[in-house]
């Protein structure tokens, strides 16, 4: 008995795993690290729980120019943007705004632009 399916020997490759990877990384970053960052920088330092001297220009500049600080700042800006733009792209499709390749390119190009600007601005410090 012959199976009733055929295997495509030259399947079309999708670029979707790349976008899903950035989407997942951005969502994880936004869910786990952004609330801590907002808590520390937006609540604890202004309330005086953390000494304001810890956030002096010299210390923040030294952190931002270190490799771990630069990666943290780039990750904080870039990864959630990839997550958001992936959601916008698929949300437009769900709402029946079929923008095709132009919408996909616009969403991911914007996320790429924000990523590039984050890297450029870190090197400008």
Swiss-Prot record:
Pfam families: Fumarate_red_D. One of its GO terms (molecular function) is succinate dehydrogenase activity. The keyword Cell membrane applies. Coiled coil: none annotated. The keyword RNA-binding does not apply. One of its GO terms (cellular component) is fumarate reductase complex. It is found in: Cell inner membrane. Its main location: membrane. The chain crosses the membrane at residues 30-50, 62-82, 105-125. Keywords: Cell inner membrane, Cell membrane, Membrane, Transmembrane, Transmembrane helix. It is a multi-pass membrane protein. GO terms for biological process: fumarate metabolic process. SUPFAM superfamilies: Fumarate reductase respiratory complex transmembrane subunits (SSF81343). Anchors the catalytic components of the fumarate reductase complex to the cell membrane, binds quinones. HAMAP family: Fumarate_red_D. Part of an enzyme complex containing four subunits: a flavoprotein (FrdA), an iron-sulfur protein (FrdB), and two hydrophobic anchor proteins (FrdC and FrdD). Belongs to the FrdD family. This is Fumarate reductase subunit D. It comes from Vibrio parahaemolyticus serotype O3:K6 (strain RIMD 2210633). The gene is frdD.
